[in-house]
Structures are given as structure tokens and as C-alpha cells.
């Protein structure tokens, strides 16, 4: 409580007057230190007050004191800030011609499906409760149970082309070699697990054929197999390398939309729509690289992220729009202690770098962060728009949160958190010279243009 009073003293000389402002606890038309004192008195006496519940989370606690101080220091309540509108956008994107690396010594050479000669083509056709596989040589073993297809092979350079519709089917691959999966107008729903499950740790080239619309759905309850992962409607033990000029819609009600135990690479041209009520949009262990394409995500699960990576996140092109609506996930650990996990548009446990493209993020749930980065954040190009409209319930909402250093040196950077802070950097914040716009007078809004 001493800390609360000390914080209150620091803002004692500051205040503002407005009609019907959030934070006017005592109803005198002014938001100032007396309102902070009113909230503190309510807490000390275990009282109740609708007006003292400044962040509207149903309780009167330290969160309301903190929000009042933020309001006074910033000179206004959230009522006086109108954030940018952020909405899903599946319109065509004019992207520059992609340069395919042709030098085998290039580190990215193997990420491009064009750099492999595919010698075998296998066709998989779904039809309701059944599936048919044709063109497979004897070295590509096929097991079919209804419309659940399992491929087991050691054959190199196999291309699988999949078509048709099933509401109770799946594709599973056991392979020792990299392979290509072409989606050529397919709709797969697996009520008991992943729609596509790749148990191969090698490169998994996912090609979305031009002019096609494809859909993958998982189910609420996964039937787990011992010693096997299936963490998403589209899961791979190896890298997921997405290309093509078609559309892929993924709906997840059981786990994540896309998950890789390696990395995820999305190339220009494709259109992805990811909708999850149970987990993340994209989950990866190694890194996530968005080089291009149009990606739209709607993530509703508590504690979930649009992009969640155990390591690095790179945004170098395309247009990615992430909308989250979940709030904080509260669980208990093995000792019965509560743990909290907040929502975020992008969560990187290592560095995040953005050099191009457009990244739009809107988080409407309480406690959410637009971008949450554990290691240095570098923004050197492209367009970033982050809006977090949620309130503080157990974790402070932030537009962009960086646990170490943050460097902004190019592009257009916009972050707005009407009930929190636009940018929170625990290390050193560096804004390079040469900007044409710098709007940082209010801690809830930050705009920088170069």
C-alpha cells in the first residue's frame, strides 16, 4: 500500500477536467489525485463502487489505481483516443516478382519447391466417407480407413495432389524424405484430430494451387497416438514451406491452425485465412518467416496468439492481419499455483525483425499485447499498425512490449493502447534520425514515419 500512496503523490499536482471522463470517481467533473484517493479508500475499507472500478473488470483493486495514474499522467481517459480501424482484408496484393535462389550454397535454396525435381506424382481424391489413391508406386504404401489416408514411404521426391471433400477424413504422412503436397481444391474435416498430419521431420512443401479454394478443419477432441504429436489442424514435425497462388482456409476448434516443430515459411502469392477458437494461428519452434502473401487471422481463444514462436519472427513482405478477442488464460501449475497467459497478436521468445510488408494487429480482449518480444525488436521497414483496446484485469495491456532493446529506423510505426501503453521497452529504445513524423506526447499512442 505504501507503493500505491507514493505513486499517487507523484501525480498529485496533475489533473484534468472533462465531461463524463473515465476515472472521475468522486463525480466532481475532474480526474485528479482525489479520485486516486477515493479508489485507495475503497480498497482499504473493502468497499464497493461502480465508479471506482475504473478498468471495468468487476473488482476494485490496484489495477484501477494504476489506470487512474496512467490517465492523469497522459492527460486524458481512453475516451479521447480514437484508434485506427483494423479489419480483415483478403483483397489482392500487388507483390514484386519473387526471386528464386538458384545457388545450392544459398541457405534458403532448399526452402523453394522449384529447386527440386519431383519424379513421382500420387493423386489422392476424397469423396465423402471414402478416399482413392492412384499413381503410387510399390514403394509408396497406402492405408485407407474410410476417408482417413495414411502414407508410408522412403521414396524421394514425391508430389501428392489432393482433391475432393470429406467431413470425416484426414491425411497422415510417414516419410524419411522431403515431399510436396499440392492442395488442388480440397476440403478435409477430421473430427478427432489433425486434418493433415506430417510425421516427417524433413521439408514439407505445401503448394496451394492457383485458382483453388481449400479448407482444413480439426475437431474438438483429438484422439492422441502414443509418441506422436498432432498440434494443429495442419501439423508437421518438419518445416512447413507454403507457396502457390490459391486460397487455404483453416478452422481449428481443438488445437492450433498451423503448427511446426521446426519453422514456418510463407511465400508471396498465397491467401491464408486462419480461424481458431482453441489455440494459436501459427505456432513454430524454430522461426516464422512471412515473406509475402495475404494472411488473415481471427483468434478467439483465451491466452492465444496469432503468431507464437519459441524463437525468431521475421516479417519481410506480404500483408498480415491478426485480430484476437480472447482474454487472459488462468491455469494452475503442478503445485496448485495460478499461472496467467495473456493474448497477443505476435509473441516471439527471441528476436523479432520487420523489414517490409504490412502487419496489422487488433487485440480487443483484456490484458492483451499486440506484439510481445522477449529479445531485441528491430523495425526497419514496412507498415506496422497495432491497436489494443482491452482493459487491465491481471496483466497490463500494451501495444508493443519488448523485454530488451527496441530499434525503430524505417517504415511506418503505429501503436495505440487506449487503456495501457503504446510501447513498453525494458531495455534501450532507439529511434533513428530522419523521421518525418513523431507523435509521442501521449504514452497510449505512438506514431513514427520515415
Annotate the PLM regions.
Residues 24-27, 391-393:
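Short, solvent-exposed loop/edge segments of extracellular or virion-exposed proteins
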Amino acid at each position: 500500500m505504501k507503493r500505491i500512496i507514493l505513486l499517487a503523490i507523484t501525480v498529485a499536482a496533475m489533473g484534468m477536467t472533462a465531461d463524463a471522463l473515465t476515472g472521475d470517481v468522486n463525480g466532481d467533473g475532474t480526474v485528479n489525485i482525489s479520485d486516486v484517493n477515493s479508489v485507495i479508500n475503497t480498497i482499504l475499507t473493502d468497499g464497493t463502487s461502480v465508479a471506482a472500478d475504473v478498468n471495468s473488470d468487476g473488482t476494485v483493486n490496484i489495477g484501477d489505481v494504476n489506470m487512474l495514474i496512467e490517465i492523469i499522467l497522459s492527460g486524458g481517459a481512453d475516451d479521447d483516443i480514437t484508434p485506427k480501424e483494423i479489419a480483415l482484408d483478403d483483397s489482392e496484393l500487388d507483390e514484386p516478382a519473387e526471386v528464386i535462389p538458384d545457388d545450392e550454397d544459398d541457405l534458403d535454396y532448399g526452402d523453394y519447391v522449384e529447386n527440386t525435381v519431383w519424379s513421382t506424382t500420387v493423386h489422392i481424391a476424397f469423396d465423402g466417407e471414402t478416399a482413392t489413391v492412384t499413381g503410387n508406386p510399390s514403394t509408396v504404401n497406402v492405408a485407407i480407413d474410410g476417408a482417413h489416408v495414411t502414407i508410408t514411404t522412403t521414396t524421394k521426391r514425391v508430389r501428392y495432389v489432393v482433391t475432393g471433400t470429406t467431413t470425416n477424413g484426414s491425411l497422415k504422412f510417414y516419410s524419411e524424405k522431403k515431399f510436396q503436397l499440392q492442395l488442388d481444391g480440397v476440403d478435409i474435416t477430421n473430427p478427432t484430430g489433425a486434418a493433415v498430419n506430417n510425421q516427417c521431420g524433413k521439408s514439407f512443401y505445401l503448394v496451394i494451387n492457383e485458382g483453388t479454394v481449400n479448407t482444413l478443419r480439426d475437431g474438438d477432441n483429438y484422439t492422441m497416438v502414443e509418441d506422436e504429436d498432432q498440434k494443429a489442424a495442419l501439423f508437421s514435425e518438419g518445416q512447413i514451406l507454403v507457396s502457390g497462388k490459391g486460397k487455404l482456409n483453416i478452422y481449428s476448434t481443438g488445437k492450433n491452425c498451423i503448427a511446426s516443430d521446426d519453422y514456418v515459411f510463407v511465400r508471396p502469392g498465397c491467401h491464408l485465412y486462419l480461424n481458431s477458437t482453441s489455440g494459436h494461428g501459427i505456432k513454430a519452434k524454430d522461426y516464422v518467416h512471412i515473406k509475402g502473401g495475404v494472411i488473415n487471422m481471427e483468434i478467439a481463444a483465451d491466452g492465444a496468439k496469432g503468431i507464437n514462436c519459441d524463437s525468431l519472427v521475421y516479417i519481410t513482405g506480404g500483408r498480415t492481419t491478426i485480430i484476437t478477442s480472447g482474454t487472459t488464460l488462468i491455469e494452475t501449475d503442478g503445485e496448485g499455483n495460478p499461472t496467467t497467459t495473456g493474448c497477443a497478436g505476435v509473441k516471439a521468445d527471441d528476436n523479432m525483425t520487420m523489414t517490409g510488408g504490412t502487419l496489422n494487429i487488433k487485440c480487443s480482449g483484456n490484458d492483451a499485447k499486440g506484439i510481445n518480444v522477449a529479445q531485441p525488436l528491430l523495425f526497419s521497414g514496412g507498415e506496422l499498425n497495432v491497436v489494443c483496446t482491452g482493459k487491465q484485469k491481471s496483466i497490463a495491456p500494451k501495444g508493443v512490449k519488448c523485454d530488451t532493446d527496441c530499434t525503430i529506423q524505417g517504415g511506418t510505426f503505429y501503436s495505440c493502447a487506449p487503456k495501457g501503453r503504446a510501447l513498453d521497452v525494458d531495455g534501450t529504445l532507439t529511434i533513428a534520425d530522419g523521421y518525418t513524423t513523431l507523435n509521442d506526447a501521449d504514452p497510449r499512442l505512438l506514431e513514427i514515419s520515415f
